[in-house]
């Protein structure tokens, strides 16, 4: 099998992980690289009426998901995996790439990284 290795140095955050204070607590060595949008995806809440709902993404032609790109260390990825409940199978890591623009002039470029996507077949807690 010839699977492409996922770049786990760049994390694309959406939803609550766009909160910089929250990210700083969860991933103290993460550095904000810039912002962008992932084209042809949309945000989707999944959950139960009486309980929590969880944010995920899914393909949707013409839609866009706003993201922040962070440079992360293995320890940050470990904390994110726990927060996103990867060990139980709620979310999985998927590769993604998009153009990211930072705060400096001419500081835009396409970065390959990863984000978390909810598994469709997973029962919600």
Which residues does each PLM region occupy?
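Glycine-aromatic micro-motifs
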Residues: 2-125
